[in-house]
């Protein structure tokens, strides 16, 4: 449904990220995580066609609806939804109520795959639990950005971590991600330790050969 090949995104002072290959299916429920400034929202904007300043291939074979910076956009945006969204922007609702209203619109059954940026940022606990229930009842998937670990663990079955300009995939919830990440870190540390040992062995061997 969403296919990315050899994607390179740069900003004026550096390469933001490079993604060799990434495929997202329509029923995937994914969290995109990573530290601030790593390019998470930029990646969503590229997928949506809102940012075309990149190298590589991005193909989307399905309708998308999304919420970025509290602004809902969909393929068939009805006058009623637009009117309600404008009311929230005009300040007639609290930030939490405005976001809840927009998320309700976004979660309409007529929409397809969702892309959502920080969906719980202005929600109280009750509103967050309602959102979790709605997301879990959906038959189609979503890709969301969030720093809320509890929310991710309850709604997502796959984690994409944007780190050091690369994407690492974890096929499980947030708890699985934490466990698997620790295993990968230990494996990399062991690999590096073995590399250093082998490097020193070869250096010693070369030194002995020179002496003889």
Language model: regions and residue ranges:
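Flexible nucleotide-interacting loop at or near the entrance of a catalytic core
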Residues: 1-4, 185-212
């Amino acid at each position: 449904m969403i296919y990315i090949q050899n994607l390179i995104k740069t900003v004026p002072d550096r390469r933001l990220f490079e993604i060799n290959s990434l495929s997202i299916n329509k029923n995937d429920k994914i969290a995109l995580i990573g530290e601030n400034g790593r390019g998470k929202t930029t990646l969503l904007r590229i997928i949506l066609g809102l940012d075309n300043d990149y190298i590589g291939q991005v193909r989307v074979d399905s309708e998308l609806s999304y919420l970025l910076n509290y602004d809902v956009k969909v393929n068939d945006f009805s006058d009623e939804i637009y009117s309600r969204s404008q009311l929230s922007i005009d300040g007639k609702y609290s930030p939490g109520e405005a976001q809840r209203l927009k998320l309700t619109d976004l979660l309409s059954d007529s929409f397809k795959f969702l892309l959502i940026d920080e969906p719980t940022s202005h929600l109280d606990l009750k509103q967050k639990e309602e959102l979790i229930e709605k997301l879990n009842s959906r038959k189609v998937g979503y890709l969301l950005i969030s720093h809320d670990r509890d929310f991710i663990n309850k709604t997502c079955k796959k984690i994409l971590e944007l780190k050091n300009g690369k994407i690492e995939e974890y096929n499980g919830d947030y708890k699985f991600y934490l466990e698997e990440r620790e295993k990968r870190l230990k494996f990399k540390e062991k690999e590096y330790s073995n590399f250093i040992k082998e490097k020193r062995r070869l250096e010693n061997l070369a030194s002995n050969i020179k002496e003889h």
